[in-house]
From Swiss-Prot:
NCBIfam families membership: histidine_hisI, PRK00400.1-3, PRK00400.1-5
GO BP field: L-histidine biosynthetic process
GO cellular component: cytoplasm
Annotated localization: Cytoplasm
Involved pathway(s): Amino-acid biosynthesis; L-histidine biosynthesis; L-histidine from 5-phospho-alpha-D-ribose 1-diphosphate: step 2/9
Lineage of origin: Bacteria, Pseudomonadati, Pseudomonadota, Alphaproteobacteria, Rhodospirillales
Gene that produces this protein: hisE
The EC number(s) this enzyme carries: 3.6.1.31
Cross-referenced CDD domains: NTP-PPase_HisIE_like
Species assigned in the record: Azospirillum brasilense
Enzyme class (EC, first level): hydrolase
InterPro entries: HisE, PRib-ATP_PPHydrolase-like
Family named by the database record: Belongs to the PRA-PH family.
Annotated protein name in UniProt: Phosphoribosyl-ATP pyrophosphatase
Amino acid sequence: MAEDKISAAVLDRLYATVQARKGADPETSYTAKLFHRGTAKIAQKVGEEAVETVIEAVRGDKAAMASESADLLYHLMVLWADAGLEPAAVWEKLAQREGTSGIAEKNARKS
């Protein structure tokens, strides 16, 4: 599906941009500023954006939810880059779980 490819390409470009800004000047780059402030601050921002996304979902505001979801994905990618986690590792986990019942998959992780 063309939309899937566009979405994947956007995420790949976003992660590449995040990585490229890792060493940028924190005075001129918000991404660099997050890296400079450290993992705890990045994780806090991920949590804040997750809560804001959930609030918009409960409110039923799809446009605001899309905006907050974009913020959440951005901050999540900053957290991944900070931890040295490549998106491919996450995509691999998702692919492994594809077609598996959520309950069965969760039970398999417990063993």
